[in-house]
Amino acid sequence: GSSHLLGSPQIGTDKNLFKEDFIMSRNLKELIRQMTLEEKAGLCSGADFWNTMGIERLGIPSVMMTDGPHGLRKQEGAADHLGLNKSVNAVCFPAACATASSFDVELMERMGQILGDECQAENVSMLLGPAVNIKRSPLCGRNFEYMSEDPYLTGKMASAYIRGVQSKGIGTSMKHFAANNQETDRMQISSE
């Protein structure tokens, strides 16, 4: 039997997609009803920088995620947000600005598959990528991490990357979706 609480990670390939989605939605609502306020809050903050909090009494495992727009960045030992601990050896692909310049969606999907394989090997459930911010300023210090100033190209390449990673049963998280172009005061800007 399957140990998945919420259904198959490959649910999108099932012919009964809408029925499965309904069952999953019902199961999620029931699961959330059983959680305490502290448990719900704990899922929002995580166990540490790279792991969600598990809830053993409900069978909810801790989930590991790691950075990965162009390669798995998983640290050995205790994780820290500064990346001061030694990283696990992994493939490092060219940055997104270079891979997107290939205009090769099949190559990007293959890259995603390889990243998915590495996630499986390192017990990572979610890869934090791709980075899809649309380049608006040449002064953005993270432009190397973004695919293009063209939303069509970014969408096509990001979709291929996601398909590849998810084909291995690994979740993805598009990041820096919008408005991540500012360098001056980037860590303390007010939204007022």
Predicted regions and their residues:
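Short, Lys/Arg-enriched N-terminal segments with co-localized hydrophobic residues
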Residues: 1-2, 7-23
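Glycoside hydrolase catalytic-domain context in secreted enzymes
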Residues: 18-192
